[in-house]
Amino acid sequence: MHVRLEAVRALEDAYEQEDYISSLQSFTSRFKTRIIQMATSDVDVSVRVSVIQVLRSIDRHGLLEDDQRGKLCLLVFDEDPRIRKGVSGFVKGVWEDDVSERLAGKKLSDVEKRQAEVKSLASLLVNWGKALDKLTIREDSSEDEESPSKRMGGVVSVMDPEKKGRTALAVEALWDEIDPISDWERLLDLLLLDHSAAAEEEEDEAPSSSSSPSGRTVVDATWRLSEAEEAIILELFTGSIRKAVGEATAAKKVCCLPDTGSASDPTPSAGRRPSCF
Protein backbone atom coordinates (compact mmCIF):
# COMPACT_ATOMS: atom_id res chain seq x y z
CA MET A 1 0.00 0.00 0.00
CA HIS A 2 2.77 2.41 0.96
CA VAL A 3 4.65 1.81 -2.30
CA ARG A 4 1.51 2.50 -4.35
CA LEU A 5 0.83 5.69 -2.42
CA GLU A 6 4.35 6.96 -2.99
CA ALA A 7 4.05 6.18 -6.69
CA VAL A 8 0.83 8.18 -6.91
CA ARG A 9 2.41 11.11 -5.08
CA ALA A 10 5.34 11.06 -7.49
CA LEU A 11 2.86 11.15 -10.35
CA GLU A 12 1.12 14.11 -8.72
CA ASP A 13 4.43 15.97 -8.52
CA ALA A 14 5.10 15.26 -12.20
CA TYR A 15 1.77 16.73 -13.29
CA GLU A 16 2.47 19.85 -11.24
CA GLN A 17 5.49 20.55 -13.46
CA GLU A 18 4.37 22.51 -16.52
CA ASP A 19 7.44 21.41 -18.48
CA TYR A 20 6.44 17.75 -18.18
CA ILE A 21 2.85 18.03 -19.44
CA SER A 22 3.55 17.61 -23.14
CA SER A 23 5.65 14.51 -22.53
CA LEU A 24 2.96 13.10 -20.21
CA GLN A 25 0.10 13.43 -22.68
CA SER A 26 0.65 9.99 -24.20
CA PHE A 27 0.79 8.42 -20.73
CA THR A 28 -2.32 10.33 -19.70
CA SER A 29 -4.31 9.26 -22.74
CA ARG A 30 -3.39 5.63 -22.14
CA PHE A 31 -3.89 5.40 -18.39
CA LYS A 32 -6.37 8.09 -17.31
CA THR A 33 -9.27 5.61 -17.36
CA ARG A 34 -7.35 3.40 -14.94
CA ILE A 35 -6.45 6.43 -12.82
CA ILE A 36 -10.13 7.36 -12.58
CA GLN A 37 -10.96 3.81 -11.51
CA MET A 38 -8.42 4.12 -8.72
CA ALA A 39 -10.02 7.37 -7.56
CA THR A 40 -13.48 5.83 -7.44
CA SER A 41 -12.78 2.24 -6.43
CA ASP A 42 -9.42 1.71 -4.72
CA VAL A 43 -9.55 -0.02 -1.34
CA ASP A 44 -7.02 2.40 0.17
CA VAL A 45 -8.61 5.77 0.98
CA SER A 46 -5.23 7.51 1.10
CA VAL A 47 -4.48 6.32 -2.42
CA ARG A 48 -7.89 7.51 -3.61
CA VAL A 49 -7.37 10.98 -2.13
CA SER A 50 -3.95 11.29 -3.74
CA VAL A 51 -5.23 10.05 -7.10
CA ILE A 52 -7.99 12.67 -6.97
CA GLN A 53 -5.31 15.34 -6.70
CA VAL A 54 -3.51 13.83 -9.69
CA LEU A 55 -6.74 14.03 -11.68
CA ARG A 56 -7.26 17.60 -10.56
CA SER A 57 -3.86 18.46 -12.03
CA ILE A 58 -4.69 16.57 -15.22
CA ASP A 59 -7.98 18.44 -15.51
CA ARG A 60 -6.28 21.82 -15.16
CA HIS A 61 -4.58 21.04 -18.46
CA GLY A 62 -7.87 20.15 -20.14
CA LEU A 63 -7.06 16.45 -20.49
CA LEU A 64 -10.28 15.01 -19.02
CA GLU A 65 -13.52 14.45 -20.93
CA ASP A 66 -16.81 15.84 -19.61
CA ASP A 67 -18.13 12.39 -18.68
CA GLN A 68 -14.91 11.65 -16.79
CA ARG A 69 -15.21 14.92 -14.88
CA GLY A 70 -18.82 14.08 -14.05
CA LYS A 71 -17.86 10.66 -12.74
CA LEU A 72 -15.32 12.21 -10.39
CA CYS A 73 -17.83 14.78 -9.16
CA LEU A 74 -20.03 11.94 -7.91
CA LEU A 75 -17.43 11.43 -5.19
CA VAL A 76 -18.82 14.51 -3.43
CA PHE A 77 -21.53 12.07 -2.28
CA ASP A 78 -19.04 9.45 -1.04
CA GLU A 79 -19.63 7.99 2.41
CA ASP A 80 -16.04 8.72 3.48
CA PRO A 81 -15.55 12.39 4.48
CA ARG A 82 -11.90 12.27 3.40
CA ILE A 83 -12.96 11.48 -0.15
CA ARG A 84 -15.66 14.15 -0.15
CA LYS A 85 -13.21 16.75 1.10
CA GLY A 86 -10.51 15.58 -1.29
CA VAL A 87 -12.73 16.02 -4.34
CA SER A 88 -14.21 19.37 -3.23
CA GLY A 89 -11.57 21.43 -5.04
CA PHE A 90 -12.17 19.46 -8.23
CA VAL A 91 -15.92 20.04 -7.94
CA LYS A 92 -15.30 23.75 -7.43
CA GLY A 93 -13.36 23.87 -10.70
CA VAL A 94 -16.19 22.14 -12.58
CA TRP A 95 -18.71 24.58 -11.07
CA GLU A 96 -16.59 27.60 -12.00
CA ASP A 97 -16.32 26.37 -15.59
CA ASP A 98 -20.09 25.91 -15.77
CA VAL A 99 -20.69 29.41 -14.40
CA SER A 100 -18.29 30.90 -16.95
CA GLU A 101 -20.13 29.17 -19.80
CA ARG A 102 -23.49 30.29 -18.42
CA LEU A 103 -22.41 33.93 -18.20
CA ALA A 104 -20.48 34.08 -21.48
CA GLY A 105 -21.56 37.01 -23.64
CA LYS A 106 -24.08 38.32 -21.10
CA LYS A 107 -24.02 41.69 -19.37
CA LEU A 108 -25.42 41.06 -15.93
CA SER A 109 -25.52 42.93 -12.66
CA ASP A 110 -23.71 41.53 -9.62
CA VAL A 111 -27.02 40.30 -8.22
CA GLU A 112 -27.87 38.52 -11.46
CA LYS A 113 -24.44 36.89 -11.59
CA ARG A 114 -24.93 35.63 -8.04
CA GLN A 115 -28.28 34.15 -9.02
CA ALA A 116 -26.72 32.47 -12.05
CA GLU A 117 -24.05 30.94 -9.80
CA VAL A 118 -26.74 29.34 -7.64
CA LYS A 119 -28.57 28.09 -10.72
CA SER A 120 -25.36 26.50 -11.98
CA LEU A 121 -24.76 24.73 -8.68
CA ALA A 122 -28.33 23.42 -8.57
CA SER A 123 -28.17 22.20 -12.16
CA LEU A 124 -24.93 20.31 -11.53
CA LEU A 125 -26.24 18.68 -8.34
CA VAL A 126 -29.42 17.58 -10.12
CA ASN A 127 -27.42 16.06 -12.99
CA TRP A 128 -25.03 14.29 -10.63
CA GLY A 129 -27.97 12.97 -8.64
CA LYS A 130 -29.53 11.52 -11.78
CA ALA A 131 -26.22 9.92 -12.74
CA LEU A 132 -25.95 8.37 -9.29
CA ASP A 133 -29.53 7.07 -9.55
CA LYS A 134 -28.65 5.31 -12.80
CA LEU A 135 -25.55 3.84 -11.20
CA THR A 136 -27.64 2.58 -8.30
CA ILE A 137 -30.18 0.97 -10.61
CA ARG A 138 -27.41 -0.85 -12.46
CA GLU A 139 -25.98 -2.01 -9.14
CA ASP A 140 -29.36 -3.30 -7.97
CA SER A 141 -29.97 -5.20 -11.20
CA SER A 142 -26.53 -6.80 -11.23
CA GLU A 143 -25.75 -10.03 -9.43
CA ASP A 144 -22.02 -9.58 -9.87
CA GLU A 145 -20.60 -8.47 -6.53
CA GLU A 146 -17.54 -7.08 -8.26
CA SER A 147 -19.48 -4.76 -10.59
CA PRO A 148 -18.01 -1.25 -10.90
CA SER A 149 -20.96 0.32 -9.09
CA LYS A 150 -20.47 -1.92 -6.08
CA ARG A 151 -16.84 -0.94 -5.87
CA MET A 152 -17.33 2.81 -6.30
CA GLY A 153 -15.86 3.69 -2.95
CA GLY A 154 -19.13 3.75 -1.05
CA VAL A 155 -20.87 6.29 -3.25
CA VAL A 156 -23.80 4.01 -3.97
CA SER A 157 -24.29 3.05 -0.33
CA VAL A 158 -25.01 6.68 0.51
CA MET A 159 -28.53 5.87 -0.68
CA ASP A 160 -29.12 4.14 2.67
CA PRO A 161 -31.99 6.10 4.28
CA GLU A 162 -30.36 5.73 7.68
CA LYS A 163 -27.48 7.91 6.53
CA LYS A 164 -27.25 11.59 5.66
CA GLY A 165 -28.84 12.67 2.41
CA ARG A 166 -26.79 13.49 -0.65
CA THR A 167 -27.28 17.23 -0.40
CA ALA A 168 -26.26 17.29 3.26
CA LEU A 169 -23.03 15.52 2.33
CA ALA A 170 -22.41 18.03 -0.45
CA VAL A 171 -22.99 20.97 1.91
CA GLU A 172 -20.38 19.64 4.33
CA ALA A 173 -17.83 18.93 1.61
CA LEU A 174 -18.23 22.17 -0.36
CA TRP A 175 -18.89 24.61 2.49
CA ASP A 176 -15.44 26.22 2.26
CA GLU A 177 -15.13 25.90 -1.52
CA ILE A 178 -18.32 27.20 -3.16
CA ASP A 179 -19.59 30.52 -1.81
CA PRO A 180 -23.36 30.11 -2.48
CA ILE A 181 -23.53 27.09 -0.20
CA SER A 182 -22.66 29.11 2.90
CA ASP A 183 -24.79 32.10 1.79
CA TRP A 184 -28.32 31.11 2.80
CA GLU A 185 -29.68 34.57 2.00
CA ARG A 186 -28.58 34.21 -1.62
CA LEU A 187 -30.24 30.81 -1.80
CA LEU A 188 -33.44 32.19 -0.31
CA ASP A 189 -33.53 35.18 -2.68
CA LEU A 190 -33.54 32.87 -5.70
CA LEU A 191 -36.09 30.52 -4.17
CA LEU A 192 -38.53 33.38 -3.62
CA LEU A 193 -38.70 34.21 -7.35
CA ASP A 194 -41.67 32.82 -9.28
CA HIS A 195 -39.95 30.40 -11.65
CA SER A 196 -43.27 28.94 -12.80
CA ALA A 197 -44.16 32.18 -14.62
CA ALA A 198 -41.61 31.42 -17.33
CA ALA A 199 -43.48 28.31 -18.42
CA GLU A 200 -46.52 30.41 -19.31
CA GLU A 201 -44.77 33.16 -21.27
CA GLU A 202 -42.45 33.25 -24.25
CA GLU A 203 -38.80 33.27 -23.27
CA ASP A 204 -37.39 36.79 -23.03
CA GLU A 205 -34.01 37.30 -24.70
CA ALA A 206 -32.96 40.12 -22.36
CA PRO A 207 -30.53 39.00 -19.61
CA SER A 208 -32.77 40.13 -16.78
CA SER A 209 -36.18 39.47 -15.28
CA SER A 210 -39.08 41.21 -17.03
CA SER A 211 -42.81 41.62 -16.57
CA SER A 212 -45.10 39.46 -18.66
CA PRO A 213 -48.42 40.62 -20.15
CA SER A 214 -50.15 38.90 -17.25
CA GLY A 215 -48.24 41.07 -14.80
CA ARG A 216 -46.08 38.24 -13.46
CA THR A 217 -42.31 38.53 -13.47
CA VAL A 218 -40.64 36.20 -15.96
CA VAL A 219 -37.34 34.89 -14.60
CA ASP A 220 -34.47 34.95 -17.09
CA ALA A 221 -33.34 31.55 -18.34
CA THR A 222 -29.82 32.20 -17.02
CA TRP A 223 -31.05 31.62 -13.47
CA ARG A 224 -34.51 30.13 -13.98
CA LEU A 225 -34.99 26.96 -11.94
CA SER A 226 -36.69 23.71 -12.79
CA GLU A 227 -38.74 21.98 -10.09
CA ALA A 228 -35.88 19.58 -9.40
CA GLU A 229 -33.44 22.49 -9.06
CA GLU A 230 -35.80 24.32 -6.70
CA ALA A 231 -35.96 21.20 -4.54
CA ILE A 232 -32.16 20.97 -4.46
CA ILE A 233 -31.76 24.64 -3.50
CA LEU A 234 -34.32 24.19 -0.73
CA GLU A 235 -32.20 21.33 0.61
CA LEU A 236 -29.06 23.47 0.28
CA PHE A 237 -30.82 26.30 2.10
CA THR A 238 -31.85 24.02 4.96
CA GLY A 239 -28.39 22.48 5.17
CA SER A 240 -26.74 25.90 5.10
CA ILE A 241 -28.88 27.17 7.97
CA ARG A 242 -28.19 24.05 10.04
CA LYS A 243 -24.45 24.19 9.48
CA ALA A 244 -24.23 27.92 10.17
CA VAL A 245 -26.17 27.54 13.41
CA GLY A 246 -24.16 24.47 14.38
CA GLU A 247 -20.82 26.19 13.83
CA ALA A 248 -21.90 29.31 15.67
CA THR A 249 -23.24 27.27 18.58
CA ALA A 250 -19.99 25.33 18.80
CA ALA A 251 -18.00 28.56 18.75
CA LYS A 252 -20.21 29.97 21.49
CA LYS A 253 -19.57 26.96 23.71
CA VAL A 254 -15.82 27.30 23.22
CA CYS A 255 -15.85 31.00 23.99
CA CYS A 256 -18.31 30.60 26.87
CA LEU A 257 -20.29 33.66 25.82
CA PRO A 258 -22.95 34.86 28.30
CA ASP A 259 -26.52 33.99 27.42
CA THR A 260 -27.89 37.52 27.68
CA GLY A 261 -29.63 39.80 25.23
CA SER A 262 -29.18 39.59 21.49
CA ALA A 263 -25.55 38.57 21.92
CA SER A 264 -26.78 35.14 23.00
CA ASP A 265 -28.15 34.35 19.56
CA PRO A 266 -25.41 32.34 17.83
CA THR A 267 -26.85 32.64 14.35
CA PRO A 268 -25.04 34.93 11.88
CA SER A 269 -27.23 37.83 10.72
CA ALA A 270 -29.78 36.83 13.35
CA GLY A 271 -31.88 39.91 12.79
CA ARG A 272 -32.34 38.96 9.14
CA ARG A 273 -33.22 35.32 9.74
CA PRO A 274 -36.33 34.13 7.85
CA SER A 275 -39.37 34.22 10.12
CA CYS A 276 -40.10 30.55 9.39
CA PHE A 277 -37.00 29.64 11.43
Give short role names for the model-derived ranges.
Residues 1-277:
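Extended alpha-solenoid helical-repeat scaffolds
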